[in-house]
């Protein structure tokens, strides 16, 4: 069964979301990431959804996210609220 990280972000400014999206596009997805979505949900908020084939892959991505949050992204991201769980329904076209 696939597992997912659902991560809520609060950014310093609305421009910070665009800066993050550019950074993420340039750095690519995390290793073994099957699906990656990043959606603006408000002026300074967004949500990311990342799906992984195994719990170990998800945990490895958590470590990388935490490292990036404390270094590369610390100036533009105000708060990161990660959640995780099993993927129960998965549709792609």
What is the role of each PLM region?
Residues 1-70, 74-93:
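Short S/T/G/P-rich N-terminal loop/turn motif that feeds into the first structured element of a domain
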């Amino acid at each position: 069964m696939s597992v997912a990280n659902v991560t809520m972000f609060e950014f310093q400014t609305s421009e910070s979301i665009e800066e993050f999206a550019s950074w993420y596009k340039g750095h690519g997805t995390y290793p073994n990431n099957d699906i990656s979505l990043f959606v603006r949900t408000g002026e300074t908020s967004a949500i990311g959804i990342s799906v992984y084939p195994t719990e170990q892959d998800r945990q490895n991505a958590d470590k990388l996210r935490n490292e990036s949050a404390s270094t590369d992204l610390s100036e533009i991201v105000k708060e990161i609220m990660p959640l995780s769980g099993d993927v129960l329904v998965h549709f792609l076209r």
